[in-house]
């Protein structure tokens, strides 16, 4: 190899021109991944907290409104009366015996925008929910509790409002940025499902009016 060629190779090896662009190309995808990741995961945390607060408000409303599900009784009836025994008097606490009050079972339904109670609750909490949420993401459950109510009185179940199948939508292309940053594969999803959230409260009397 001639001295001229050797000199050219050494000069090229010592040349620092363009190194800044190379470093920028390496660092920029990592920076963007961290930056947009902080934004999206911050949004996800905020939406999760707001959804929890929405469930608390929904349960408070559902506890004092007519049932959102069909088939929920309005009054507590007698349970099974054993032969040759005196039926319990109206006004007897349900907790006084296992069969004092009839157990209508647990009644569950999905939120329906056509139901007045579900519609009122959705109008109150929809602003706190992710934009992809609909009334169908709400589930209402009315469960009998023998510690509540008395024979002949208004039915007072434990009311549970649950949000389910709620997805968070990422707005940043985190998968593509991760690939540019050198991450193997691209397994980051565009959506992430929130865990089921629920709040339970004892019903006051499942009032027959609205907005009261």
Feature locations, PLM:
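N-terminal leader/signal peptides at the extreme start of proteins
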Residues: 1-17
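N-terminal signal-anchor/signal peptide hydrophobic helix marking the start
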Residues: 17-30, 40
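Membrane-proximal amphipathic alpha-helices
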Residues: 40-54, 67
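Short, conserved structural patches
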Residues: 2-4, 56-212
């Amino acid at each position: 190899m001639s001295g001229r060629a050797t000199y050219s190779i050494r000069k090229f090896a010592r040349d620092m021109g363009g190194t800044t662009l190379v470093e920028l190309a390496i660092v920029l995808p990592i920076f963007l991944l961290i930056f947009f990741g902080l934004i999206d995961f911050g949004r996800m945390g905020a939406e999760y907290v707001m959804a929890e607060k929405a469930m608390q408000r929904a349960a408070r409303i559902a506890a004092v409104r007519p049932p959102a599900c069909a088939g929920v009784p309005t009054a507590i009836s007698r349970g099974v009366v054993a032969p040759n025994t005196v039926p319990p008097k109206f006004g007897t606490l349900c907790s006084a015996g296992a069969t004092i009050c009839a157990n209508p079972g647990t009644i569950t339904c999905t939120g329906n925008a056509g139901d007045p109670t579900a519609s009122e609750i959705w109008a109150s909490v929809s602003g706190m929910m992710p934009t992809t949420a609909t009334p169908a993401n709400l589930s209402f459950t009315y469960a009998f509790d023998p510690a509540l109510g008395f024979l002949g009185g208004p039915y007072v179940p434990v009311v549970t409002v649950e949000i389910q199948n709620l997805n968070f939508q990422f707005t940043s292309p985190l998968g593509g940025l991760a690939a540019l940053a050198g991450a193997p594969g691209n397994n980051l999803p565009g959506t992430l499902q929130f865990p089921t959230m629920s709040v339970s409260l004892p019903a006051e009397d499942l009032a027959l009016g609205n907005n009261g």
